């Protein structure tokens, strides 16, 4: 985790706790010539734009007040909901995703695939099982949790 992400996580957590919001993810990424500091937040029932603006304003005030500046380069601050394809980071995210359609990225390919989508039907501390449609049939596939690089909710077409 970069120092910018760590700093922002520490700064935003009390703001979110005060409002009963949840921190989903903080990322600091360069896209083209620009840096983006993205803070994804949520709450029970979903977060709205006014709540995102409130958190953005409070976080911006805290960042601006720090000396020395914890993020010396210019960047764009974005505070938003995680959206329909919310990342699955914490154990509670996975538990809430049981029965839902998800996308997983694997470190090592399984059956020649590193990107797999299916309905999460079971999980435990070591593995998760997806119901995956392959051509015209549905098959249950089990994956080691340690082989999962990323997971997120997915939209099924």
From Swiss-Prot:
Gene3D superfamilies: Ribosome maturation factor RimP, C-terminal domain, RimP-like superfamily, N-terminal
Protein's GO biological process: ribosomal small subunit assembly; translation
Cellular location(s): Cytoplasm
Keyword terms: Cytoplasm, Ribosome biogenesis
Family recorded in the similarity comment: Belongs to the RimP family.
Signal peptide positions on this chain: none
Record's protein name: Ribosome maturation factor RimP
Entry function: Required for maturation of 30S ribosomal subunits.
PANTHER family: RIBOSOME MATURATION FACTOR RIMP
Cysteine disulfide partners in this protein: none
InterPro entries referenced in this protein's UniProt entry, alphabetically: Ribosome_maturation_RimP, RimP_C, RimP_C_sf, RimP_N, RimP_N_sf
Top-rank lineage group of the source organism: Bacteria
One GO CC term, this protein: cytosol
Lineage: Bacteria, Bacillati, Bacillota, Bacilli, Lactobacillales
Keyword Cytoplasm on entry: yes
Transmembrane segments: none
